[in-house]
Amino acid sequence: MPEMKVRDVIGVECIVQPGPFSDERLITFDTTDGPISGFVQEAELRQVGKTWLVRAVIMAVRDDFLEVRVRGSFFTTNGLANIQKRHAVAA
């Protein structure tokens, strides 16, 4: 993946399950602090082979991780998360 920078749109690997509404999905993805779960609109997701990706915007680039914002409603965060760079895919 090319060098990542602030405001780049990326995909973050996630697990997808049905949500409460037809256009919403429950997702879980790994962060540096452990997994987080929440609801996102179906339009924020794409499937590449067997892998699901949720759209995220890079807010900060650190040596070991990325700070990203994921649009949605999460149980333990406001959508900001620190993820390992290996979980990021070019959008």
Q: Where do the PLM segments sit?
A:
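Basic/aromatic-rich interaction segments and small domains that mediate binding to polyanionic partners
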Residues: 3-85
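Short intrinsically disordered terminal tails
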Residues: 1-2, 88-91
